[in-house]
Amino acid sequence: MFSKLVTGIDMLLYSLSNLTKKNLNDYCFIDTASNRTTLVAKDGSLISIFAIHGAKKIVGAEELEAIQEKFSSELLPIFKKQGHQIQFVFIRDPSRVKSELKRRLDPYWKAARNLKLDLDDLFQSKVDHLAKYCVYESCYMVAWSRPIVIKAELKDDQAKNNELLTGLPPAIGAQSSYRLYESLENKHKAFVDLLENALRISEINFKLLEVKEGVREMRKSFDNDGTSDNWEPLLPGDKPPMSVKPKPYATELDIGDKLWQSISHQVFTKNCEIVSPDTIRIGGQNPTESTKDLDSSDIKYVASAYMEVPPQQTRPFKMLLDQLDNDIPLQISIMIEGGGMEKMALKATAAALLTIANGNNKLIKESIEKLREVEMNGDTVVKVSINAVTWANNTKTLNLNKQTLIKVMQSWGTTDTMLCNSDPIEGFTSTIPGFSPTSPANPFVAPLRDIVPMLPLTRQSHVWEEGAIIYRTEDGKIFPYQPGSGVQTTWNYLIFALPGSGKSVLMNSDNFASVFVPGATEIPYIGIIDIGPSSSGLIQLLKDAAPENMKHLFVYERLKNTIDYSINVFDTQLGARAPTPAERQFLVNFLVNILTPAGKEPFDSSDNLASAVITEIYKYYADTRSGNPKEYIKNRNAEVDEALAKYNINAKGMNWWKVVDTLFELGEKRIASIAQRYAVPLLEECVSIAERTAQIKDIYSKPISDTQETLIDRFSRALSENIAMFPVLNNPTQFDLGEARVVSLDLDEVGKGGSPTDDKRAAIMYLLSRYIIGKNFKLDDSLLKVSPPIYHQYHQERIDKALRTKKRICIDEYHNTGSIQSIRRQVVTDMREGRKWNLQVVLASQVYKDFDDATREISTGRCILSGGDSYRDIQKAFDLNETTAQIVRSRLTGPGKGGVPFVFSVTTKTGIFSQYIFNTISPTEMWAFSTTSEDVTIRRMLTAALGAATARKILATEFPEGSIENFMKRFLKEHEYDEVVKSNPYKVIVERLVKRYKQL
């Protein structure tokens, strides 16, 4: 009996201590968790926290009005009465930008290390450079459902809870569950569902946070430096700690130390002290008068302000941020409560009684009547409270920041803003998302529809959480991007930009990012088809970063139309006696392209003839009873002859297929693949197949022109003409990429279009390049059907690996293919089948009209780097809103100091996003990707002397513009009479740079 009495007194004392907010923990209203996404407050309120990423599309005046209408219309009914409220918290913190950039890059930085690529300097340069242009920001919407919502059921629910508590020991300082009201849960779920729907129809990107994520964000708001990204609170469902640390007023009956510690104790990890009516100090020891103005990393001074008088005009949230420099931290809370008119009832009564005595009260009464009219006309009046904090590591900077904050808030719609003059701790904690349902700010009432523009809903939303590329918005919001990720179902990208608009830089960034796949143990397949050397810098960067045994995986080759570069499109997979369906489709497209006259449409049945020839030619040269396999001839290939001699194999009388099988069974896979080049058909052999196969002659011997030329005649003539025109086509393969994974083929000498004949030549070389880089992209079980059993295990392993390996085809200067349908058809096939093969397809050209309707229709990413007068056509082609169209018209200005601006429209699993962003790359990246002759020469020489990473660091430091071109002009002019410099200026510059570096 006495023990129970003592316990009761202890509990009473503990409760009384909470009546006065002297303890920091008393400012936390959160008690515990109810389920995966719902927290419970100390009064039984239920709380859910949303991360608001922003608007999916660029928002201007027209789009803001639409969001205003949709969002407010959804919430009107529920806010007519008291009980539900939402809090918006927006945080901008410049001190967190570097850690945030690292967090976003981290999985891909680790992937580079896992792949043994030495690129730490490049990733670090991204962080350091972007930190100059970006700022950390986050936004949350907190849904509160208060017990007043269940006023009728509340008494019964409280009785049930009290009954459950009977006989339970006290648990001081721990989380409890006796305040959970069952009747409120359904109401809260309906409220959360309503909010989710309002966000969706308003095209706002969001995430409903799990309770552990929500509490982590609370703690980060209080102490970001002391909170790991992996930190998690202990909540019901977790194993409780077996602590023996005594609690205030604890007795031997108290079990609080054996349960989950209160959320407030888990969030408040540092001491907090009031230092002035508007300022608190978090962390650190008491500074002296002489040290309080000095920066201290373990101390944060926080000043609180609130809106004293409501704004005279509603102004968008963007206007507040536009007036605030990125280096000034901000945490602002906008609390909206339902039942605004109910809260005005007392004011209305008082105003009615005092109307005669005071003229001002007539104005109050008239204002209330106007608000009633608002509700009568379909809107809802809500109660709004707005307060904010800023901070610094010393009092001098804090004073400057809070003065700026006051001015900015006052100009946001013309309002009066005051520094907190009562409880600055409450001023701060009330801006922590979900921490408290109250605000120290003076509340005002307003129509809900008028408040929506003031909310931080319409910031540009990112799409990816993480990425090897970090783009940014114009005002510094971080925008990660990762090609080929699970955010999309297919990865078909169109990039268009006039020369000088930054296309090459963007493509190099994208292709670089594609190399890194978290968890991957091998380099993905990336094939780049280009006109010119713009991607050679990327290949050299990767080659320099790779260890010696991996350098062969990265290849840049300038393709030539000579026998030395022979590529036989009739090659098959090792041991395969026929092409797979994907390879067969490519061959059909290739032969149709040859058969079609320059500038003309394909003849009817061209594809059928090509298909028939392909079937018959492999059948004819097969090593079957009815086939005519090619006989082995000594001295055709020295490596094959040496391998046969090594194993004492007499190949006389053997056919090439037998040689292939024999070498394969001996484990000589590479030599077997070389031997197979002599077993497969050649292009010129298609002529005899078409002319002597009875079934083909019967079908395709009818005249197709006034000259009485048949389709077979045309086919034979076209083959002969193209064989003469392209020595690269009609010989056993000599150009072999081996095990290369990232390949750039430069078609500058062979792939330029213009006239119909040039377009056709370009198309053939593009198709040939597509074949050589993609021949291992599309492997599946169909390969086993065309291969003898001895190859099945080998191919099954390749198939399994190919299906899980990411692949990417990037075709630049796409306009050079003209209107050649065969290559367009191949590209569309690749795009449509991309998901099946884990394949990304990127097409880049100068104007959007270079892409036909089919490619535009199935594209899932559009990068628009220039538009100008074509902006209306681009708007229509890609369904852009009016604000985005105006950006395309006038704000895509090409490379500048802050990077390359572009409009990025992307189709994802959660909808279409269209954003205006910047590709801002560091001097280190610019030097890595540069392909001008001067830059390549100086980079190569410095790399030879000091290594790639050190060379990049020196060049980025000495020439931060990313090129030596301007410096070289000045240097040569200054030393125009110096014979040593004139004979080899690069050598002189490199020697000076090396000497300076070694002296450091």
Identify the role of each PLM range:
Residues 3-23, 219-355, 423-453, 498-500, ...:
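C-terminal regions of RecA-like/P-loop NTPase motor modules
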Residues 345, 477, 484-501, 506-511, ...:
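Conserved P-loop NTPase motor cores
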Residues 621-744, 748-751, 759-775, 895-1000:
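Conserved P-loop NTPase motor module
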Residues 60-64, 69-77, 464-556:
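Glycine-rich phosphate-binding loop of nucleotide-binding enzymes
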